[in-house]
């Protein structure tokens, strides 16, 4: 008979929300395998931010600006994601229309209609289990690392600001939960909470979504930041958290590294 931890891990792995794991573990890296809840003022700014007049970055410019292996001190950056892990907007459905931006965010897509976009993924380094750890504890230690899918999207005609408004409104409208379906898999989100967002962007929004996998709940996290006419999306998961249900720390250093490249 499987233990509760193993069962939780199996359930979490089958959830559509955790398609991010497949993306983060596949593809090719740039240079190989190198070794307090609360609302933020930045999130609230989205309701009144003036549209940016900045020309949207082209796909080539986004590629140059996107996170690279040399930009991070740990983990692995993947630049070539499998096509099967790049879920199109029209393949994602939510039970509530107001929650559509959150469903798209959860599966590693984007809100609105960008002029261009590029994707990356980042996987944190694996942790070593303590000496004498049980098999289950060793498994949890190996899984205790964040996996992030990064999408850079540039928008014309104030589209970046509008996308932030839509995401912020969806977070409020869908605080009580929603469900979404992607590639035939339905995922239930029990609740959505706005948390403290990273600094350094024109606007930023951070969310913790409580995923309900057949009664076993765990937190998935997302950050979206705007710099001019470009949005950077960072949906993230931690499989150890999915197995245990415990909270985990979003890797804000990835956001900082990406923001540093967006001028």
Where do the PLM segments sit?
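Sec-dependent bacterial lipoprotein signal peptides
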Residues: 1-23
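Short, low-complexity, Pro/Ser/Thr/Gly-rich segments in the mature regions of secreted, periplasmic
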Residues: 251-262
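A short, solvent-exposed beta-edge/loop patch
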Residues: 190-252
């Amino acid at each position: 008979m499987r233990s509760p931890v193993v069962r939780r891990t199996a359930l979490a792995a089958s959830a559509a929300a955790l398609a991010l794991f497949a993306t983060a573990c596949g593809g090719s890296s740039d240079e190989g395998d190198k070794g307090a809840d609360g609302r933020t003022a930045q999130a609230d700014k989205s309701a009144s931010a003036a549209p940016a007049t900045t020309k949207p970055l082209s796909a080539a410019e986004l590629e140059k600006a996107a996170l690279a292996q040399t930009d991070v001190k740990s983990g692995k950056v993947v630049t070539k994601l499998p096509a099967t892990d790049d879920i199109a907007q029209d393949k994602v459905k939510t039970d509530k229309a107001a929650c559509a931006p959150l469903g798209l965010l959860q599966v590693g897509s984007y809100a609105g209609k960008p002029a261009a976009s590029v994707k990356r993924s980042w996987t944190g380094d694996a942790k070593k289990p303590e000496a004498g750890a049980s098999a289950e504890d060793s498994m949890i230690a190996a899984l205790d690392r964040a996996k992030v899918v990064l999408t850079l999207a540039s928008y014309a005609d104030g589209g970046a600001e509008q996308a932030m408004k839509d995401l912020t409104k969806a977070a409020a409208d869908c605080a009580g939960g929603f469900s979404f379906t992607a590639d035939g898999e339905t995922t239930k989100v029990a609740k959505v909470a706005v948390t403290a967002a990273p600094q350094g962007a024109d606007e930023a929004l951070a969310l913790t979504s409580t995923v309900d996998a057949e009664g076993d709940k765990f937190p998935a996290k997302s950050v979206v930041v705007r710099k001019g006419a470009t949005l950077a999306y960072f949906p993230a998961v931690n499989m150890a958290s999915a197995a245990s249900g415990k909270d985990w720390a979003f890797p804000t250093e990835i956001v900082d590294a990406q923001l540093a490249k967006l001028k």
